[in-house]
UniProtKB/Swiss-Prot annotation:
The protein's name in its UniProt record: Major surface glycoprotein G
Pfam family name, one: Pneumo_att_G
Record-annotated membrane-spanning stretches: 29-49
Gene: G
A GO biological process held by the record: symbiont entry into host cell
Main location (coarse class): host cell
Amino acid sequence: MGSKLYMVQGTSAYQTAVGFWLDIGRRYILAIVLSAFGLTCTVTIALTVSVIVEQSVLEECRNYNGGDRDWWSTTQEQPTTAPSATPAGNYGGLQTARTRKSESCLHVQISYGDMYSRSDTVLGGFDCMGLLVLCKSGPICQRDNQVDPTALCHCRVDLSSVDCCKVNKISTNSSTTSEPQKTNPAWPSQDNTDSDPNPQGITTSTATLLSTSLGLMLTSKTGTHKSGPPQALPGSNTNGKTTTDREPGPTNQPNSTTNGQHNKHTQRMTPPPSHDNTRTILQHTTPWEKTFSTYKPTHSPTNESDQSLPTTQNSINCEHFDPQGKEKICYRVGSYNSNITKQCRIDVPLCSTYSTVCMKTYYTEPFNCWRRIWRCLCDDGVGLVEWCCTS
């Protein structure tokens, strides 16, 4: 009998397994890979757009806060109080307004009480003008401002506090109170200080404080008559002498003022210097207005500058507040610009109904205010609130 051959066709177990996994891969693995790739691309695109937007905002904020376009700035929003409570004048070249929100940028630090007095740059630079403006626009000096716009407002600064007080028109002579209406409130530039016989006269009538308290007294007339004789403060006699005079003679000046702040300072008379022509203009008994109109800069700048500031160690000289030596805020301030539109803001829930004053300054402390930034102060009705803004 013959044999027959049979052919059996099929697949082995190995081929079956390979085919199974290839089928799984075609169905699921490809879908997973594509999903992961799409998700990664989406996240990357979203992050890129966010970074671009953030960099744009930061650049605008940096340009606004780091530029040298304006030295001073205030917030400009709709007033929340009556129009009569809004400051009507431009004090020292600064325009203030009561605001609903406070201007700031990015990193904000609130501080009560501490003026960071360890840095003479901050204390001398800002307090020279900004705090006086804050006093004038605050509730203390604005209470009777509409009735008596010529009243003087004083600002006293010490190590950790600022005191504002208002002197009524009755306590000052008529020529002193009427003088600010004839003068330009803008501060002269430091280019004009060469012809000024008293380059440091900005603090002449205000720099006699106790040697244990670091501070100065500013009035609404500081900076308007630098070339004239010292201005008569409340409590001075009729011959034109102020509480900072250094002439010898009987100390029969009144020792009390309207607010009783300077009764101790008028008794601390410094011995006269050896110059023969020291403040001869103050020895006349002519009225103040006549004396000022006939005053001629006959004294040398050296003699005048020696007499303008006391020799105490703790006195603040506002001229030298800038470590770079480029700006002297007591002599020159930047122009106010109300057309700034690009502003980075963070709402500071303080001082919602009181004025705010901001300026660019140099910080040495605290640690997050070490660079040139905006420094702002406002009055919350109890005391001064300070915050800083870094870009």
